[in-house]
């Protein structure tokens, strides 16, 4: 009797192998169906290489009677290598108790005999795992090496392997010295945005892995910027269950993660690699001081690794504050420019070790020091009933920050039974610590104007606003003027501990228990110093208001979370899962926020009387407490959240026209519904001067639910998923207090004891498919908010004061629909087209008014956005690649509000890119793009900017060196001005950044492979 049960033990542990398992289990049932009510126990074991612990293909074996070694049954051997999981295993069916011998063999390995003692078959036990089996290789024989046969073929860029999308890294042209981020940007159906945000077929990835293992806790920017592209063999993408819910009751109800897994070439799977890069350059144009700003880049990256361990050390230093590379399609518009000068120094390390498929531990430590200098000058207009107001502001800020992060985790797994009590034991422990220290210095000068006269003084505006005596324009048009100097310094510490435990009874596979325990503690301390002067140049009756403010802030918070749960597998094939869980959460917060007005002291009422950061004696300082703007509170929150969920799983094979199943084409689907009811008791002890001294309690019972559906046709790369969720939340307790905060004289906030709960409905649907070499995706979502929290305000046109009150409004909703397609124009894939289209609508409801209306009224703004992005790539040879493309964005905003000016604005770009490999190991890459804006009523916002970037490189193979020169914005047309328009107003901001510069840098590569035996 042939019994194929492949990995049935993993069927309930890992959704990614459920198709193979369920099919194999079905065969076991068929083979045993000749007898009714026959109990079948599936016995399986992992099989690995004795030294490397790699998977072994071609496993086979038999089950023998231990007493006389007679043949009993065949054994199924298989392997699995998808979705980041590798497994080679043997599996057999046991129909009656007894002692057996399992004979395991594979080509090139010594045969192994494993004893198997089954004392009893239990009614509700369907599988049992054995300890991992390790095979030793046979001694090597003398072999004759044959000459290599070279076959040239068109390189396939991507294909489907089951439900995994696989990209072939060697099929893409890349510039010399390219890191992983340059490769990812070229993958069909993939887009990458600033900050390492990556979308695959329209869906954002949640986690990035290296060879199936987490890398720096998914710090994808570190991996993207430091892993050389030449080391990569494949980039794969697939969905998987998040690590933090594996084994828990919510495993099947949890939203799956979209993963991008970077697979290295075989020659880089073991050994040492090191990369060093250094460079320097200058801006092409002079700064405000008449000098060229210097640019520098330094990078060190070293990694020792094999299939089961990894050690990484890295160091980075640069002042580029940029992430783009010349010669590629990029976003070089002013909106994508950096906002200041930033210098960063980073040092860190990472380690990983796993062994015997039983434990895995990993950790990392990283420290960063940064210096930032920002200077911003801005013009703005605020749209108001009865007439707009206008503003000019000048801000400078210097920041120094240092932080250190360390995080470690340990996984322990024991699949086989432990005595007669439990099996499938999984333990997870993760501690982490973060410490941050900072120091900020800033100066600000601003004015609010009743008329748009910003252009009349030009650069002299700053001197005019800063001058003690207001000039003629300010005396005529300025509603108010502020000048301030500030200093903020502090530090924070955050510790986090998370642990999981889950297991099954030793002889019952229809139930699983889990327990999660976590604790978080944070401590925050900051000191704010501020010299603030407010005056009213156009008024002869309103006095100036100078404040010397000191605010020491202390916040401490800790959270304890305990969550037990149980999963019941129902049905003969366990296709139903009933998940019952309970979550207990305890949160304790303490906050102390005093405000001291040092200007109340004699001799402290002028900005130049005492240096910023100077404090009087303790007794003097206590006498200046602004009690009504100081608060002290302690809040405790205890929450009990029962949860119930039901999951139905479906699977099968695709059928042909005749109704016959196609063996290698399978499908998988599930439907899940989950319901939660968090019930919380909150207690807040709050004091605020003469306004409030109260002990406030609140009991809330909320309802939350979500329904998720998923369907996947593995081999064809087709998937459909949808989700509906309802989230309810209660307003912050401090917003319910009847208090007034006027610590900022131009921004006064009030409380509202009549706030209601907010309810958010979200609908999401997504479809993706692959037709040959064509990739297509479409998605849509709708979000509806009931009783949305709005910070309604009344604006006083005479003083410029905003009085803000939280309130609930109905009518807020938005929708978004998009699609993307990536396809070849020719069979040889030399011409390729990529297109993305998107439409969004936002129905925004807010509350605002003026001192003329006295009340805040509903303000509804309707905004439509349409985006079309089209690009064409031509790759005539492996040494050349050219591209052309364009992007159009249209914004249309309307409102029934009086004095509202409709917005009909266009932003569009078009350009070309090219990359050519030259003789003498040289390469040139360049891009030329025109960025334009049209449709703005303000003429200065309708702009054209032609941007040209280029890179030239020279490779020195013998020295393992690459020399590169990058030229950014060679024409000097890219502005350091950002312009924004929305329903609330428009802003034009100037930043202290010169985006036009050149950089010469050198890259050194080192790679050491292990000696071949």
Stretches with model-predicted labels:
Residues 17-35, 64, 105-107, 127-170, ...:
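Short, acidic, small-residue-rich periplasmic hinge/interaction motif at the N-terminus
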Residues 33-35, 44-57, 69, 155:
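Structural motif
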Residues 60-84, 149-156:
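Short amphipathic beta-strand segments in non-cytosolic proteins
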Residues 70, 88-89, 95, 99-118:
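A short, solvent-exposed loop/turn motif at the edges and junctions
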Residues 78-95, 197, 223:
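Short, surface-exposed beta-strand/beta-hairpin micro-motifs centered on an aromatic residue
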Residues 164-187, 195, 200, 210-215, ...:
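Short, polar/charged loop or turn motifs at beta-strand boundaries
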Residues 214-242:
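Short acidic/polar hinge/loop motifs at secondary-structure boundaries
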Residues 218-221, 243-294, 308-1013:
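Primarily recognizes Gram-negative and organellar outer-membrane beta-barrels
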